[in-house]
Amino acid sequence: MKKLLIIFFINIFAVNSAYSVDEVLTSLKEGGKIIFIRHALAPGNGDPENFDLNDCSTQRNLNQRGIEQSKFIGSIFNKHQIKIENVYSSEWCRCIDTAKFAFQNYQTFSALNSFYDIRFEANEERQITQLKEFINQWNGKENIIFVTHFVVISSMLNIGTSSGEIVITDKNLNIIGSIDTL
């Protein structure tokens, strides 16, 4: 774990931040930030044809490294005593598992679901609208976390993310920084 924390501090905000590590951590401690987390490592791409939202055995799931990565994500928030109001997760098992291993407490939110697959791509506009409305109604006092998918983060923030990457924004979705946890 100590080695992972050293790697974290070497890599944190290396490319995607206009702020130093201390400034970003201070910003998170102030609250009022939206934290997008792409689910941890789940080998493969998309989901199998027999995908069933209610059956994790039909989905692409976290591997052991993804589970460890999820726990590491949680340790970042614990180590720096960053307060979280709520953790919201996509209903996909890999997102739920990321949220569970990182933060224990979470609730699912269908607006965070993937629309990568042709079966779900028609949901994009409705989901993004719902997510933006949710953010607009949020009081913005404490930090909130969204554990979701590449396509949702890309649609919301116009950036690409790696597995387990943490992207921090303000309420207006201005990117403050990102943490690559690989």
Predicted features, each with a name:
Residues 14-22:
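Boundary at the C-terminal end of the N-terminal hydrophobic targeting segment
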Residues 120-128:
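Short, surface-exposed amphipathic charged segments that create phosphate/polyanion-binding patches used
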